[in-house]
Amino acid sequence: MHQQPRGPARVSSPGATTQPNLPSRSNSTREAALGSRPRAGSNLVGRDVPNSPSLESPPIPAPPADSVRKLDQIIQNFYAKAAVLVLDSRIKSRPARGANGARKPNKWFQIETDEIDDFRDELKIWKNCGSLDNRPPPMVIEVYLDASRLKDSQSLVIVDENGKRWDVMEQLNSYGSSTDSSGASRRNNEVVIERWQVELKHSGMTSVDFGPILPTVYKKAIVFFRSLFITTRLLPAWKFASQGAAKNSHPALIPRCRIRLSQPDRPRYDQLRLPIDGRPDPVTEYVFGDLEVPVGRLSTLVTYRSDCNFRVDDSEALLSSRFMGVDENFFRPSLPQQHATSRAPAAEAGSLRDHRSKPNLNDIQQAYGSLSTFHGNVPIGTSPISALRSVRQPGSDTSSPPESIPAQHDVGGPSSLPVRQGTARPHLPALEGLGRRPSVSFQPFKAGSLSGSPVPRQLDAEPASPQSLTRPGIPSLRQAGNRTSLTAGMPASLRGGPPTSSGETAVAGSPRPASTSRYSSSFTHRRGRLSFGGASKAGDDEQGSSGRQSLASSVAQPGSGLLAEVAGTSSESLRDDNEQLEDFIKALDSKKTLQSFGPSKTGESATNKTVAQLSRFHMMRDSNNALTESMTSSVQMQRSSSSSSRQLTSVPGMTAPASVSASSSPGKPLSPHTPHTPAIPSRLSENSIIDYSGQGRITSRQGRTSDNTQPGTIRENTITQDGTTAIDIPLSPRLATYQRRASSVAIQNRSMADDDDTDSAFAHRSISLGADDREPPTLSILLGRQMQLEEDSTQRPSDRLEPAADTGSTETPDMLRQGLSEENPPEGLIPAATSSSPFGRRRYMGMASHKQTPPQSSRGSFNGSLNRQVRGDDDSVNEEPLVFDLSEMDPQGRRSIEEARSGASGGPNIGPDRGGYESRNASRRGW
């Protein structure tokens, strides 16, 4: 029974269906034995008959002709538009013109272009193709350079990314002669730089009607051509063609185009894919997205050269440069050579031989951080300086502990100049890591941070000889991570240097500069540099552990002589000879080291210098204290005669007389920032000061003793007493402020009234403000004081305050104290509104014209500091000549006032004056 399905499988085979006796075989004796199975066999035969190729299937209905015509137009214009976009971006095409001479625009796919005449015959193939019957072939557009127009003395060259020139024709012909099977050798004069390919890939018959999806196909084609237009302007050939047209360059550098029907006949000899600049993969391919059409897919591909830096050079110059070896190995990248068994002895790059121990790469200690945050495989508690002594750069000229770096391999120090690659380099070990090209750089900081990337150290082989004619190249691979950020950030004086000669020795120790030679005998003229070696002295460990370096080692500037290993640690320079290195060293020596950064001749460290400076300032403190005590004693001595009678019991003092500080001005808030100009009495001028006090106070003291017991003269006595020491106007201290009180009686008396209030608030007067340094009284002052005493003895006590203050006010001491308690300005600051003296009126008007509304500063407040930012009467204070004129004229004006006052009573004069003063207090409170 298992043979039952095998019979129908044999019948349904294609070979069996072609035989004419199929029905007789289905009714054989085997089917009779099966019983009910003959129907199944007949069903299988009847089922396979329609599928037989001998029988015609019913024809599929053809799509509408209108849909086919629209699809043909889309495909035809797709090829034409793609060709126009590519050709117009690479060459100067000639637009096609109509009968009237106008251009023929093409607005298909929403990109307006012009019909061109250059490739009209070639494009006819795709303009007459169809989607179903006359299917289009692939269209290939090549952009190339024609070198046949070059002269015999000219060569088409390409400059690679490293600056080396390559002869393009020589490279192409060398590949062509080796791969050409024919015996005839022909010279190639074309360089293909770009190839475009557009192809319709069929997928079979379509459905009955595809007309409804054609608008969608057209919209997708719009997006495709926008992408194509942008891509043609981004490829290297577009830039090369644009520059050639703008510069009117050589005809061999003008791109040309051609259209082909297929790929080149010989695929092994593809001129586009042949390398011409030494790179293994010279071309790049870009595939656009396929455009789905009802009959298949429209695909577009572009293959272009990645480098199009072509130019025309002289053949003789190119040949000469090749003989000189200038273009050989110019910045040739060094690739990793995986030969772990290579143990060739490595020497530090340079012209000096190596005679040092070879440290093992695996034993190099990793350390990073700064002097304050040092991390490394060192015992806990080790200071950064101590760790630096043990963690030395392999290859430095200072000895290291034998247990820190075993001697097996040599590792070059960090390079500070461009590195030249030697002509003969052994294979490097496999454990090397990729490194970067060192550059000329100077670290601006004393130590690197944790964020600084470690600079790898370089493993160099035999040093290149000075007679090498190779161009400097990228240095070989170096060990990644061995250069710590701490070593990278430190100045050159803390890092290792070039190898020393066999006769040179150096000691490892504290960061004390050592006068060790940094170069061999060829450079003995170079003076010694600061290094991280030398004998230890007292104070060095303290300096290193605190994170501070010496002045000479912490500042490393170019040309200062501290970067001693710049020339010694470079592998190879651009001109690899000893003369250039010697010139560079001389250039470093030509710049003089700054005196503050240079090494000390006596070897004194920065710590000792700092201690010496601090000691000098410490010694100055004693003289400063002695001067302060002298100032304090002079203040107390001058105030001893008048301090007992200056206190007003009604207003408590802000500062007691006994609390005079030696560091602040007496009579001011004890603040070190209080601005004042101290008038320090000198021993040379003590006699003159005594003369001033004797001449300037004799009159006022006589007046005080004569009327000391009268109750009506309490205010006058206080004013006369305070006039010798108090401030006339509580302004910022000035050198010439005291002249206002020594000029005239009017100004002096007004200042006496002011000083009474000021002194009652501060309880004493500062000697630094010129309290006793008064000018000798003039004859006019003595005459005015004599007249004042005579008038005081003849008038009633109620009128005695008017000529003294020159304001016409008759306030009593009780009213004065009341005004002080309300923080009103003193009477001497603002003259009365109806002053009896016309000159005093002039002074008030000048102040009012300067500023109508007085500023609210601290000058009128007796609870704050006397320092103020804004003063309303700066002009009146600075007008010193006007004050002197008023002082000289006040006695005559006062005599005229007294003559007019002798015939009238004092009552009418008292009321207006007092009223004017009270209104002024109301409007100028707190000033």
Curated annotation (Swiss-Prot):
Its main location: cytoplasm. InterPro entries: ATG13, Atg13_N, HORMA_dom_sf. Gene3D superfamilies: 6.10.140.1900, HORMA domain. It is found in: Cytoplasm; Preautophagosomal structure. Disruption phenotype: Does not significantly decrease the growth rate under nutrient-rich conditions. Strongly reduces conidiation. Causes only mild infection in point-inoculated spikelets of flowering wheat heads and impairs the spreading to nearby spikelets. Also reduces strongly the production of deoxynivalenol (DON), an important virulence determinant. GO terms for cellular component: Atg1/ULK1 kinase complex; cytosol; phagophore assembly site. GO terms for biological process: mitophagy; piecemeal microautophagy of the nucleus; protein localization to phagophore assembly site; protein transport. Residues 793-803, 891-901 have a biased composition (Basic and acidic residues). Residues 14-30, 393-402, 513-523, 544-557, 684-716, 850-868 have a biased composition (Polar residues). Keywords: Autophagy, Cytoplasm, Protein transport, Transport. Residues 1-66, 334-359, 388-559, 628-716, 786-927 are annotated as: Disordered. Pfam families: ATG13. It comes from the Eukaryota. Residues 630-671 have a biased composition (Low complexity). Hypophosphorylated form interacts with ATG1 to form the ATG1-ATG13 kinase complex. The ATG1-ATG13 complex interacts with the ATG17-ATG29-ATG31 complex through direct interaction with ATG17. Activates the ATG1 kinase in a nutritional condition dependent manner through the TOR pathway, leading to autophagy. Involved in ATG9 and ATG23 cycling through the pre-autophagosomal structure. Also involved in cytoplasm to vacuole transport (Cvt) and more specifically in Cvt vesicle formation. Seems to play a role in the switching machinery regulating the conversion between the Cvt pathway and autophagy. Finally, ATG13 is also required for glycogen storage during stationary phase. Autophagy is required for proper vegetative growth, asexual/sexual reproduction, and full virulence. Belongs to the ATG13 family. Fungi subfamily. This is Autophagy-related protein 13. The lineage of its organism: Eukaryota, Fungi, Dikarya, Ascomycota, Pezizomycotina.
